[in-house]
Amino acid sequence: MKLATLVLVLALPAAAQAPSTLAPTGTLRGVFLGSNPVQGRVDTATGDATGPVPDLVRELARRIGVASNVIPAPDAAGVIAALNNGTADIGFLAYDETRAREVDFGAPFAVMLNSYLVKAGSPIRASADVDRAGVTVAAVRGQTQELFVSRTLKNAKVRVFQTMPPQAEVERLLTSGDVDVFAINRQRSLEAEAASGAKLRALADSFLEVDQSFVVAKGARAKLDAIAAVMKELNAAGFMQRSIDRAKLTGVRAPGVK
């Protein structure tokens, strides 16, 4: 490469160099947890994805001048698989050390709170009341909350579900006493409380505050560097907090926002 050409390439802004790094196919393919409202929601009728992650993927694609494709995955394992088999370029997950063995994590795009859900008449009033003998805590396998409670609770029993039960089953499990607590994110806890007709109650405090972050396939750190350059501009402009507010999410905030 001639010296003049090399100087020109090095002088290009990161966003100008990002297309080949982030979207080698010409389309930025972002995979996210389609069942997690903190990241986004998928309209079952149209298939359209809305929310913070879809907004972010589309804005990143616009800024680097490529098309975008937002891909919902059923769970964290699906996000990781899509990255490592090359069907997605970037993904989004809450940080956990076990996941970091399979994918590389970048900077957070949001901070998520997690709150236990109990039946309305439960004597459990705060997160500190949960880890006691005789208490059964439900969680969904592989989700951030399950990884946390399985690792940290010493006295309570953890009951792991393969998938998130529907609202009616969550109500039955809690009100019947089959389980005493459901460990989910705050947005889901509040939605379940609201839908229950006063049968359920989300605890007021958070048992875990966790970063929602960009993830890429192992060894693809160059993608995270390219994303960081664009995200610096987006964060300065308040892009993520506006997206979170537009989605009417509770217990979620952009990094640096109190």
Map each language-model feature to its residues.
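A ligand-binding cleft/hinge motif common to bilobed small-molecule-binding domains
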Residues: A77, L93-E102, F148-R151, T175-L208
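Hydrophobic h-region of N-terminal signal peptides that target proteins for export
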Residues: V7-A16
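Ligand-binding clefts/hinges and TM-proximal coupling segments of bilobed small-molecule sensing domains
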Residues: A18, T144-M164, R201-L203, K232-K258
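Bilobed "Venus flytrap"/periplasmic-binding protein-like clamshell domains
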Residues: F32-P37, T46-R63, S115-P166, Q187
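Extended ligand-binding regions for polar small-molecule ligands
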Residues: D48-I64, S122, A128-T136, Q143, ...
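Periplasmic-binding protein-like
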Residues: G34, V111-G121, R186, A194-K232, ...
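Acidic, polar ligand-binding/catalytic clefts
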Residues: P54, R58, R62, A67-D131, ...
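Extracytoplasmic small-molecule ligand-binding "clamshell" domains
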Residues: A18-A94, T163, A226-I227, A237, ...
